[in-house]
């Protein structure tokens, strides 16, 4: 699936070796694998299962056997010709940015993640998706050991969404005690992590969502929950320090209305930017700060998230699981919206 790679290598730690601690051996990968691909952008029906060569990693990458792959809105947008479609170069195009699986080969001896290690992480975002497949090549610095408390299906639901939430809540909003944070779409993949992280770091969380998700959002840590269908949030939230907007102006001018509840100098954070191209000018006119955020794959942050997940400080919710061959149905589901937590593809048995 991955082409145009300039430096290839024969892995020094092969799938048939054991480490000094007796790391279980991993079967050598086959020459070919199953993968979900598409030739031209379009509706979910353009997705198809194909047999393609197992990818060859470069010196900074691991080869992993994918056990489960997360499905994200960016996947469906990219398939339709939006999202990060312009960054793709391979033909046919692959999809899938996050995964959980097992290391098959490493670029050098004494690698901290030897063959047989259970890991979770991201492929090279945005240029090289590929987790909708039996095997994937992934940047060494974009993976971490899988949380021991999670199944592979649960772990595959974490990387892209939780890393995005961490970037929003911790690195951009700098969530802290006494801060009031409004999070739109708190029940989605990114949203349910953002609610938990903001609450964990001491912020007072106000979350919007569907009526059926409101009790669950309270369980996740939101102190105020708002049914977006029946209540205009600006009528009840008062003034907030930060708005994390996972909707933008796609629905009911949510972005524009959010600016009115921010304190002077407050911070508006938009994901994704395409949902409201004029957000920066509107924020300046309203006397508030504004920025956008795009996920950065980071294994060290994933390791921190793994510790939080293992301790029970945060949790992941998987709404539905589809087989790899059902990727089309998974895309149709995520495009319908109103998902609670994440959708995951089950790629292989452990």
What are these regions (language model features)?
Residues 159-227:
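Mid-domain Rossmann-like dinucleotide-binding core that forms the NAD(H)/NADP(H) cofactor-binding site
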Residues 235-242:
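A short acidic, Gly/Pro-enriched loop at the edge of an enzyme's catalytic core
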Residues 249-314, 346-350:
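Glycine-rich phosphate-binding loop and adjacent beta-alpha segment
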């Amino acid at each position: 699936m991955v082409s145009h790679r300039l430096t290839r290598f024969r892995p020094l730690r092969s799938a048939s070796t054991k480490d000094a601690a007796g790391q279980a051996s991993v079967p050598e990968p086959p020459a070919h694998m199953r993968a979900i691909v598409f030739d031209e952008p379009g509706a979910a029906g353009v997705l198809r299962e194909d047999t393609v060569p197992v990818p060859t990693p470069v010196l900074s990458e691991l080869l992993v056997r994918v056990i489960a792959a997360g499905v994200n809105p960016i996947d469906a947008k990219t398939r339709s010709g939006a999202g990060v479609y312009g960054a793709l170069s391979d033909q046919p195009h692959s999809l899938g940015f996050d995964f959980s699986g097992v290391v098959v080969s490493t670029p050098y001896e004494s690698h901290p993640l030897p063959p047989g290690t259970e890991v979770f992480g991201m492929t090279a975002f945005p240029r090289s998706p590929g987790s909708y497949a039996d095997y994937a090549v992934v940047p060494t610095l974009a993976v971490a050991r899988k949380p021991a408390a999670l199944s592979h299906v649960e772990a595959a639901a974490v990387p892209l969404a939780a890393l995005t939430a961490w970037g929003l809540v911790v690195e951009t909003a700098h969530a802290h005690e006494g801060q009031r944070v409004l999070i739109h779409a708190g029940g989605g993949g990114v949203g349910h992590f953002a609610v938990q992280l903001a609450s964990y770091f001491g912020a007072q969380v106000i979350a919007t969502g569907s009526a059926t998700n409101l009790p669950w959002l309270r369980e996740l840590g939101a102190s105020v929950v708002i049914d977006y269908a029946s209540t205009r949030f600006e009528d009840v939230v008062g003034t907030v320090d930060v708005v994390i907007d996972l909707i933008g102006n796609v629905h009911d001018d949510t972005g524009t209305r959010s600016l009115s509840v921010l304190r002077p100098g407050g911070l508006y954070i938009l994901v994704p930017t395409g949902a409201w191209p004029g957000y920066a000018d509107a924020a300046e006119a309203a006397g508030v700060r504004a920025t956008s955020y795009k996920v950065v794959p980071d294994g060290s942050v994933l390791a921190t998230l793994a510790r939080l997940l293992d301790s029970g400080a945060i949790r992941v919710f998987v709404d539905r699981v589809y087989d790899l061959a059902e990727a089309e149905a998974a895309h149709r589901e995520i495009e319908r919206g109103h998902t609670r937590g994440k959708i995951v593809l089950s790629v292989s048995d452990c």
